[in-house]
């Protein structure tokens, strides 16, 4: 195992610099732009090869007790600040991956440090409650001033959870219970003795053969139910039993969009027709569909607002619940607080799941009938974590104080324009640019994607990929135009090295 690990380190060493030296890019702080973090570096700083000697030694040590084969880098979070992530060797990288889209307001955000040091936080941490049985007296206040303060339009209730997979899993349970409740004739109808007994044998009618429909290339998590709806990569699913649930096609759009409007509209219509056919004909009745506003792990695949409005109409027409997975797209990343706000739906989704940038998790809903008809049906010991809910409240306060959703929309437009220029200059390396008008939630395809990502560290950028060929940008909400200038300059440097 040790030799295999050393081999993987050698592969990652391709990010090394020609010599061990400090390198900085040219900072271009825009005159009218005040940085949110005055103490963050003005540009990336590279002090050693990547990985450096301290990082390699620490990785070897960690490998003795923890599987590090997915390791990207070991970070020093005591020195990371704002948009910059530090490693153990003194390197400071501009982070446009942000813990897989999970850090919203910067490393070591001063306001969040105050929240973390508050007596309220200390009480939540050392007296963690079983929320379903023993919530704190201020739990309603915490929810109303935090998670529910930013609830999607029309959804005024929440079930809190631990992670994105958990949020989706519990949303599926809510959909199934609602479906059967409607079949019985309402929440007041009692279970039959046959249902009770057969459920303990995992047989019908107590364990009904129902399904959740998801989309090709979608990602919804890695638990049993959520993994059955995940369709992005085989490595996530191999050897794991899965439910017999339908998969609908997701539109495969051609770019630039303005040059392929007719073809793309036809493609979206084809996918909508197939989705409705599957709902009507699948042998296990479909209780709900789940869809990402942008397929994030599956390759940053987009569809138009008209497509999603069409999906909503299909679900209403067929009495199927509509679940929107905002785990990666939510909390401001697309230039609106929730990505589905771009769609202008006539009626809201039935449930919206969230996590990542929220630093907590759960699903929003509005219909009281989505509460199970009896207690303990949607339940676990923790049912979320008050300490994480407090952090999300602090994040919301920062977003509102600094107008970070608006910043992300404006910075995204600026960044996209710069990428359009690079795409014209280097069309073989920057293909199918997408995400216009979607904040900083931008991606493109490149034939040498993996090499591109590795070389990113060599110019001081921590950047990620998705799908087979996509480079995805997931900067924080505090990412500004002067950061975009650094990123654009760095992307051009990488391209010239390919």
UniProtKB/Swiss-Prot annotation:
Localization, UniProt: Cytoplasm
SUPFAM superfamilies given for it? PLP-dependent transferases (SSF53383)
Name the cofactor(s): pyridoxal 5'-phosphate
- Give the superkingdom in one word: Eukaryota
Keyword tags: Aminotransferase, Cytoplasm, Pyridoxal phosphate, Transferase
Instruction: Write out the similarity annotation.
Output: Belongs to the class-III pyridoxal-phosphate-dependent aminotransferase family.
UniProt-recorded name of the protein: 4-aminobutyrate aminotransferase
Its organism's taxonomic lineage begins at: Eukaryota, Fungi, Dikarya, Ascomycota, Pezizomycotina
């Amino acid at each position: 195992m040790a030799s295999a690990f050393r081999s993987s380190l050698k592969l990652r060493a391709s990010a090394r610099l020609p010599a061990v030296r400090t390198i900085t890019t040219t900072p271009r702080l825009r005159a009218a732009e005040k940085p949110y973090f005055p103490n963050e570096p003005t540009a990336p700083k590279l002090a050693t090869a990547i990985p450096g000697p301290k990082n390699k030694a620490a990785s070897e040590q960690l490998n003795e007790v923890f599987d590090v084969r997915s390791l990207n880098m070991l970070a020093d979070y005591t020195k990371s600040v704002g948009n910059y992530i530090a490693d153990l060797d003194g390197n400071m990288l501009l982070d446009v991956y942000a813990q897989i889209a999970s850090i919203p307001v910067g490393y070591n955000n001063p306001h969040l440090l105050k929240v973390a040091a508050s007596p309220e936080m200390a009480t939540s941490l050392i007296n963690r409650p079983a929320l379903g049985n023993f919530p704190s007296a201020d739990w309603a206040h915490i929810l109303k001033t935090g998670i529910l303060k930013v609830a999607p339009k029309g959804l005024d209730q929440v079930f809190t959870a631990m992670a994105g997979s958990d949020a989706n899993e519990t949303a599926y349970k809510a959909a199934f219970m609602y479906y059967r409740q409607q079949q019985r004739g309402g929440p007041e109808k009692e279970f039959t003795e046959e249902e009770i007994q057969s459920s303990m044998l995992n047989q019908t009618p107590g364990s009904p053969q129902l399904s959740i429909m998801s989309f090709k290339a979608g990602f919804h998590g890695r638990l049993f139910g959520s993994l059955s709806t995940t369709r992005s990569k085989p490595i996530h699913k191999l050897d794991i039993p899965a439910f017999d649930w339908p998969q609908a096609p997701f539109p495969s759009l051609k770019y630039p969009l303005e040059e392929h409007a007719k073809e793309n509209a036809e493609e979206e219509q084809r996918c909508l027709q197939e989705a409705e056919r599957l709902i009507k004909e699948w042998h296990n009745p479909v209780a709900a569909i789940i869809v990402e506003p942008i397929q994030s792990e599956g390759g940053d695949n987009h569809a138009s607002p008209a497509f999603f409005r069409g999906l909503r109409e299909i679900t209403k027409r067929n009495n199927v619940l509509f679940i929107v997975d905002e785990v990666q797209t939510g909390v401001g990343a697309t230039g609106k607080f929730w990505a589905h706000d771009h769609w202008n739906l006539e009626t809201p989704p039935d449930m919206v799941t969230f996590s990542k940038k929220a630093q907590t998790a759960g699903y929003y809903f509005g219909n009281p009938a989505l509460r199970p008809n009896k207690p303990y049906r949607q339940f676990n010991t923790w049912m979320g974590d008050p300490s994480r809910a407090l952090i999300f409240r602090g994040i919301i306060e920062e977003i509102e104080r600094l107008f970070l959703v608006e910043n992300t929309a404006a910075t995204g437009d600026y960044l996209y324009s710069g990428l359009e220029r690079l795409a014209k200059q280097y069309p073989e390396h920057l293909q199918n640019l997408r995400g216009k008008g979607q904040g900083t939630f931008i991606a493109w395809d490149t034939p040498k994607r993996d090499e591109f990502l590795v070389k990113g560290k060599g110019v001081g950028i921590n950047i990620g990929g998705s799908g087979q060929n996509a480079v995805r940008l997931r900067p924080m909400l505090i990412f500004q135009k002067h950061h975009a200038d650094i990123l654009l300059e760095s992307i051009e440097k990488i391209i010239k090295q390919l």
